[in-house]
A protein has these predicted regions:
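Acidic low-complexity segments
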Residues: 1-99
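Active-site loop and adjoining helix of the penicillin-binding protein/serine DD-peptidase-beta-lactamase fold
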Residues: 97-107
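Hydrophobic/aromatic-rich core segments of domains that either
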Residues: 71, 106-195
């Protein structure tokens, strides 16, 4: 564990496929993906299945279906850091989607994953941390004076987060962000000219 005052640095290479690439990925999913990431509970909620079909009625590709569900959740379910207990005998996710209309990240992610799976699109939950708070260059941690690089963020336990990932053949797992209090993902439509090989 990290003690107060301690810091560590993480560097990562992020894959940010274009919308064009995701739309063109198709549906030739490997068996190891479909065996595990299309599973649904027995007697899964018919109202949630119907909602998934309604939301994605005009979506032509798995990417467009995932994006439509993401947008629906961001627009129709208000973020709340706490959720009361659902009425006895009620499916909690159904209650959140159709009555309570408030959720936090785990419920946003669960709703998107389960709706995608009802459509035959492999999806899974990822957990970790959101971006945290940006630090201004030259600003230190906990009052210390030290040089901080641009694009440095402070991440705390309240930044714990969950989000759905969707599988695209030839691309792999791609994150989506349905949680209403998080910034939407910025995914390029097509490769920029300066991204092409020289």
């Amino acid at each position: 564990s990290i003690l107060p005052g301690e810091t560590y640095q993480v560097e990562a290479a992020l894959n940010n496929p274009t919308i064009e690439e995701l739309r063109a990925a198709g549906t030739e999913y490997p068996k190891w993906v479909t065996d595990k990431y299309l599973q649904l509970p027995e007697n899964f909620s018919q109202p949630i299945r119907s909602l998934a079909l309604e939301i994605t009625a005009n979506a032509e590709t798995p990417y467009d279906q995932a994006f439509a569900i993401t947008q629906y959740l961001r627009t129709n379910i208000k973020y709340s850091p706490t959720i009361p207990t659902a009425p006895r005998g009620t499916d909690r996710l159904e209650w959140i989607l159709f009555e309570h209309k408030q959720a936090y990240c785990v419920y946003y992610a669960s709703a998107e994953i389960l709706m995608l799976r009802t459509l035959g699109i492999p999806a899974r939950m990822a957990v970790g941390f959101s971006q945290g708070t940006g630090t201004t260059p030259g600003e230190g941690f906990a009052g210390e004076v030290e040089e901080i690089e641009v694009n440095t963020f402070t991440v705390r336990k309240e930044n714990a987060h969950a989000w759905p990932e969707v599988y695209f053949p030839g691309v792999g797992w791609v994150e989506f962000e349905p949680t209403g209090n998080q910034a939407p993902l910025d995914r390029p439509l097509a490769p920029r000219e300066d991204d092409s090989p020289t």
